[in-house]
């Protein structure tokens, strides 16, 4: 018996996916990055961290993150945004100004009991 709807990498069709990005290479990078975010979401779900956004389309049991990512791209719920050199420089400067980790000792203000 044959399936009427194609499954696997051909669903959604590559032509429909390429309407949302300008090249196959960018499509692969975009879908892979989004699939990693979805995978991280599922990994963090049990821990209650929820640092990543979960699937934005309906999913089925045992559906792979890459398939979910491609369906999100086809539906237009995620968009690829290319950063120019100015945006990258501004983001790097902001990251250097505000460190993510404080290196100060929280117990430095406490009196030394041996003194």
Swiss-Prot record:
SMART domains: RNA_pol_Rpb6. GO terms for molecular function: DNA binding; DNA-directed RNA polymerase activity. One of its GO terms (biological process) is DNA-templated transcription. Signal peptide: none annotated. Disulfide bonds: none annotated. GO terms for cellular component: DNA-directed RNA polymerase complex. It holds the Pfam family RNA_pol_Rpb6. Its EC number is 2.7.7.6. Keywords: DNA-directed RNA polymerase, Nucleotidyltransferase, Transcription, Transferase. InterPro entries: DNA-dir_RNA_pol_omega, Pol_omega/Rpo6/RPB6, RPB6/omega-like_sf. The keyword Transcription applies. It catalyses: RNA(n) + a ribonucleoside 5'-triphosphate = RNA(n+1) + diphosphate. It comes from the Bacteria. Belongs to the RNA polymerase subunit omega family. Promotes RNA polymerase assembly. Latches the N- and C-terminal regions of the beta' subunit thereby facilitating its interaction with the beta and alpha subunits. The RNAP catalytic core consists of 2 alpha, 1 beta, 1 beta' and 1 omega subunit. When a sigma factor is associated with the core the holoenzyme is formed, which can initiate transcription. HAMAP family: RNApol_bact_RpoZ. This is DNA-directed RNA polymerase subunit omega. The gene is rpoZ.
């Amino acid at each position: 018996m044959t399936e009427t709807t194609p499954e696997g990498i051909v669903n959604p069709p590559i032509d429909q996916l390429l309407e949302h990005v300008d090249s196959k290479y960018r499509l692969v990078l975009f879908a892979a990055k989004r699939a990693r975010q979805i995978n991280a979401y599922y990994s963090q779900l049990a821990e209650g961290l929820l640092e990543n956004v979960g699937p934005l389309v309906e999913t089925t049991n045992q559906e792979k993150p890459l398939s979910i990512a491609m369906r999100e791209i086809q539906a237009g719920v995620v968009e690829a945004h290319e950063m120019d050199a100015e945006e990258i420089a501004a983001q790097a400067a902001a990251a250097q100004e505000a460190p993510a980790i404080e290196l100060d000792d929280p117990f430095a203000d406490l009196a030394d009991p041996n003194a």
